[in-house]
């Protein structure tokens, strides 16, 4: 039998993309609740073994939660929802399963159901940091910034070592034009998870906003070291180089962005300015 709760929210990662354009928050359908995909085939093996566990222990809520997470890794969101539903039917106080189901609903663009599940998770456990974080991301995407900010404050209070809540709160401060507080939050996110690219990119955007172009170049390069196929990262690097007056590197960076995403607006506008 799988241990109770099996470490809470399993694989549905509240991954926040950096802003799509400088000073803007990603639209509601962009990187709302990403699931780590499994290219190794391990999830299929896990699903089979977890199905055996469930057959032997049909009232094991943690096994349903774990298999639901494996389904989500494979992009099988309806199967994931079904398993998370079984988990909360067996254990109505299983906050992590409500959060996981909410994240699966977000992938299915069923935001009303997702919001209801985040709320229910907090009824089950008012101190569940992941539920505050997940609800904040949804509220942020819907433009409800004060409510999202309040949820992120709670998430950080409950889990001060979590990088994602600092990153998410930094994006809200950035949207509000408070780049000083945004940079502080991005610093905290990077301190806690130095291998995530999005906080570097977001901090680079805030550095541009406050005129620290050398620091912005460093941050966009750091983001691109994590993901060199990030068109927005190349476009942001182009803006930073352009602000420095380095025309050649700006053109090169904008060109790299266009080669990845020919419709990247920041890069297209940058190339138009420099032609």
Language-model features and meaning:
Residues 8-17:
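Bacterial N-terminal signal peptides
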Residues 40-49, 75-86, 107-120, 142-154, ...:
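Structural signature of tandem alpha-helical TPR/SEL1-like repeats
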Residues 61-62, 95-96, 129-130, 145, ...:
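Helix-start (N-cap) detector for alpha-helical repeat units in TPR-like alpha-solenoids
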Residues 2, 16-66, 70-78, 82-85, ...:
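N-terminal leader/linker segments that initiate helical-solenoid repeat arrays
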Residues 21-34, 41, 231-275:
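Terminal, low-structured helical/coil segments at or just beyond the last alpha-helical repeat
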């Amino acid at each position: 039998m799988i241990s109770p709760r099996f470490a809470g929210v399993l694989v549905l990662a509240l991954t926040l993309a950096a802003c799509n354009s400088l000073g803007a928050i990603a639209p509601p359908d962009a990187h709302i609740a990403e699931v780590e995909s499994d290219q190794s085939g391990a999830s299929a093996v896990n699903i089979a073994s977890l199905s055996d566990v469930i057959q032997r222990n049909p009232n094991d809520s943690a096994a349903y939660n774990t298999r639901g997470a494996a389904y989500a890794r494979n992009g099988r969101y309806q199967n994931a929802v079904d398993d998370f539903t079984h988990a909360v039917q067996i254990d109505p106080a299983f906050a992590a399963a409500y959060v996981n189901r909410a994240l699966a609903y977000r992938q299915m663009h069923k935001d009303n159901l997702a919001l209801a599940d985040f709320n229910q998770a907090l009824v089950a456990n008012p101190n569940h940091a992941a539920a505050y974080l997940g609800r904040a991301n949804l509220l942020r995407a819907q433009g409800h910034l004060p409510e999202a900010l309040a949820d992120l404050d709670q998430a950080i209070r409950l889990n001060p070592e979590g990088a994602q809540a600092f990153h998410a709160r930094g994006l809200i401060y950035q949207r509000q034009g408070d780049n000083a507080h945004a940079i502080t939050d991005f610093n905290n996110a990077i301190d806690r998870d130095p291998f995530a690219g999005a906080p570097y990119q977001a901090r680079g955007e805030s550095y541009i906003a406050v005129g620290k172009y050398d620091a912005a170049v460093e941050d966009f390069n750091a983001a691109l070291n994590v993901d060199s196929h990030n068109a927005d990262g190349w476009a942001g690097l182009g803006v930073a180089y352009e602000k420095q007056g380095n025309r050649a590197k700006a053109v090169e960076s904008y060109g790299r962005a266009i080669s990845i995403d020919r419709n990247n607006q920041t890069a297209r506008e940058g190339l138009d300015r420099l032609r």
